[in-house]
Amino acid sequence: MASQHDKKSVQSGLLHPRNPHRGRYDLDALCRTCPELKMHIQIKPTGDKTIDFSDAKAVLCLNRALLAHYYQVSNWQIPEGYLCPPIPGRADYIHYLADLLAEDLPTSAKGKKIRVLDIGTGANCIYPIIGSQSYGWHFVGTDIDPLAIKIAGMIVQANSCLNGKITLKQQLDKKLIFKGIINEDKFDLTMCNPPFHASLAEAEAGNQRKRKNLGHGKENRAQEKLNFGGQNAELWCPGGEIVFLRQMAEESVAFAKQVRWFSSLLSKGKNVAPLKKLLKQLGCKRIKVVEMAQGQKISRFIAWSFSQE
């Protein structure tokens, strides 16, 4: 069978239909769930309620409220300097992966038998939280940062609803991605939010642009792109995402029979074609590019499989 190359279009500005974060935030409901959010509420000239998305403490508090309200995770805290992820956009990746898996397993794409590997889980542990609470999947989260693994582990331990659903594992060799992690294991999915930037300077410039946009009042669902924190490994690597994902693709060959679908977010559209070309050369049977909309921003992930089913 020839390799399949799918590019799914999305309705402009709309999150996945199953994403509970579609539409405006219900800040009143979130404040009832997390009363501390009240101190960060501001009133716009229109009379609508909002928060200051350039205020790291306000964004962190909003995340705690969202996780408690929608995912029953009431104990979530990350130290200053680590990524404070945009919950709605992160949830979209999970829901579109669920669609991808359901194409292969229409009657059994939920539950603890589904095993997902999250590369670069980070201290926030956000993908395992959303995936396990939304679909009951079992996650293995990895990171090269021992402190990130420790903090994520504390989050899992502090929330009984996550116990037994999330396993955390440090990647001891910073030069490797799958090797030393998958070993003899098997997974239905792998996922990754890779370091997008090629240098620290590029990462800092990106954050400055986000701050500038907020300063000009561009407040919409795209404001959730804010990631003003971040350790070096979370934000950049030599060569940027294309180098990282080429290595990921090449390493995936060794685990072709152990993983149903490999996947990763892909921030730069220009990187799609060279990655698809490489994946074809590596023998992938199925390659898909799935677009996701968050406000005015279109993001995407690339997924590949060495099986034809």
UniProtKB/Swiss-Prot annotation:
GO terms for molecular function: 23S rRNA (adenine(1618)-N(6))-methyltransferase activity. The keyword rRNA processing applies. One of its GO terms (biological process) is rRNA base methylation. Specifically methylates the adenine in position 1618 of 23S rRNA. Keywords: Cytoplasm, Methyltransferase, rRNA processing, S-adenosyl-L-methionine, Transferase. GO terms for cellular component: cytoplasm. Pfam families: Methyltransf_10. Belongs to the methyltransferase superfamily. METTL16/RlmF family. This is Ribosomal RNA large subunit methyltransferase F. PANTHER family: RNA N6-ADENOSINE-METHYLTRANSFERASE METTL16 (PTHR13393:SF0), SAM-DEPENDENT METHYLTRANSFERASE (PTHR13393). It comes from the Bacteria. It is found in: Cytoplasm. Its EC number is 2.1.1.181. Residues 1-21 are annotated as: Disordered. InterPro entries: METTL16/RlmF, rRNA_lsu_MeTfrase_F, SAM-dependent_MTases_sf. It catalyses: adenosine(1618) in 23S rRNA + S-adenosyl-L-methionine = N(6)-methyladenosine(1618) in 23S rRNA + S-adenosyl-L-homocysteine + H(+).
